[in-house]
Curated annotation (Swiss-Prot):
Compartments reported by the entry: Cytoplasm
Gene that specifies this protein: mer
Assigned protein family: Belongs to the mer family.
Organism taxonomic ancestry: Archaea, Methanobacteriati, Methanobacteriota, Methanomada group, Methanopyri
Gene Ontology biological process terms, A to Z: methanogenesis, from carbon dioxide; one-carbon metabolic process
Annotated metabolic or biological route of this protein: One-carbon metabolism; methanogenesis from CO(2); methyl-coenzyme M from 5,10-methylene-5,6,7,8-tetrahydromethanopterin: step 1/2
Physiological role: Catalyzes the reversible reduction of methylene-H(4)MPT to methyl-H(4)MPT.
Source organism (scientific name): Methanopyrus kandleri (strain AV19 / DSM 6324 / JCM 9639 / NBRC 100938)
The protein, known as: 5,10-methylenetetrahydromethanopterin reductase
Length: 349
């Protein structure tokens, strides 16, 4: 059986103490990674992860995911160094291009091609280059500085560094990637790739692109942790698990390009109807339009036996980490415990 680790993704939209508690529950149930979303409208990932670091001892902790635009890379580096120190060397970094819904509210274009951290630049810069440069700045910082960088997207002065992390430049860097350029770049520069997908068909497309980038950088695919950032829902009652996932699946359908919908045989007209309903705030109609094909394509949902079967198919497609993402289950804490009791042990035998 292929080796696999388990992570959990949590949206910090509830009390920080509650989210930190769920991370502790995840650690107690065999999860190895905790990823916290980074959006302006929720609690700070840094605050939540700091709380979690104090009450946990093994689970790795990091933003899942942040972006190169809404926070200066030196500030991100300081946050990560601080988290690594507080957690005793358990920090990880997840970084991607951001998301349209958040950027619209912040007045940023998506995809963002503005060289925000280099005011002298005149040319547009794509997300892959932005992430590559921001990573280089962050790791200069984590090596102890001083940081001095001039690229297409980022330009700094000579920045001295007082903060010291425990892992230094060995802190793992994960890149959120979907399209071919981002996947290939992740294969070149990242320790892991966070792919927003729950179905083997998507990894049959993604993994070769990751491997292509790895080979060009003189690396092996075996060096890269391929993480399925899933829409996940588990309950002993399979119908309840599926029902809980429908609103999340509706949003995934709305945001999926036609090429992805066609890959899974999804009716594009129905997808447009879902997008229209969500746009009007009519979530009941959107949920009602979610069908079995959409659930199958965009989620891992069901009872423990069903979930195990679906994860086994992901492993065959090259996945090495399964991230249990929203909604997790009808009851988050019970779902985390159920994964720990009846899913993770199956893959650790």
């Amino acid at each position: 059986m292929a080796e696999v680790s388990f992570g959990i993704e949590l949206l910090p939209d509830d009390k920080p103490t509650k989210i930190a508690h769920l991370i502790k529950v995840a650690e107690d149930n065999g999860f190895e990674y905790a990823w916290i979303c980074d959006h302006y409208n929720n609690y700070s990932y840094m605050g939540v992860l700091t709380l979690a670091a104090v009450i946990t001892s093994k689970i790795k902790l990091g933003p899942g995911i942040t972006n190169p635009y809404t926070r200066h890379p030196l500030i991100t580096a300081s946050n990560i160094a601080t988290l690594d120190w507080i957690s005793g060397g358990r920090a990880i970094i997840g970084m991607g291009p951001g998301d349209k819904a958040t950027f619209d509210k912040m007045g940023l274009p998506f995809p963002c091609k503005i060289p925000i951290w280099n005011p002298e630049a005149e040319d547009e810069v794509g997300p892959a280059t932005a992430i590559r440069e921001v990573k280089e700045v962050i790791y200069q910082y984590l090596e102890g500085g001083p940081v001095e960088y001039e690229g297409k997207y980022v330009k700094t002065g000579t920045a001295d560094v007082n903060a010291r992390s425990i892992q230094g430049s060995d802190i793992p860097f994960y890149m959120g990637a979907q399209g071919p350029i981002m996947l290939k770049t992740a294969g070149e520069i990242a320790d892991g790739v966070l792919v927003n997908a729950s179905n083997p068909k998507d990894f049959e497309v993604a993994v070769p692109k990751i491997e292509e980038g790895a080979k060009e950088a003189g690396r092996s695919l075996d060096e890269i942790d391929v993480a399925a950032y899933t829409c996940f829902s588990i309950d002993k009652d399979e119908d309840k698990a599926i029902e809980a996932t429908k609103i999340v699946v509706a949003f995934i359908v709305m945001g999926s390009p036609d090429v992805v919908l066609e890959r899974h045989g999804i009716d594009t007209e129905k997808a447009e109807q879902i997008a229209e309903a969500i746009g009007k705030g009519d979530f009941g109609t959107a949920i009602g339009l979610v069908d079995e094909d959409m659930i199958e394509a965009f989620s891992i949902a069901g009872d423990p036996d069903t979930v195990v079967d679906k994860i086994e198919e992901l492993l065959k497609a090259g996945v090495t980490q399964v991230v249990v993402g929203s909604p997790i289950g009808p009851d988050k804490e019970k779902a985390i415990e159920l994964v720990g009791q009846e899913v993770i042990p199956h893959f650790k035998e």
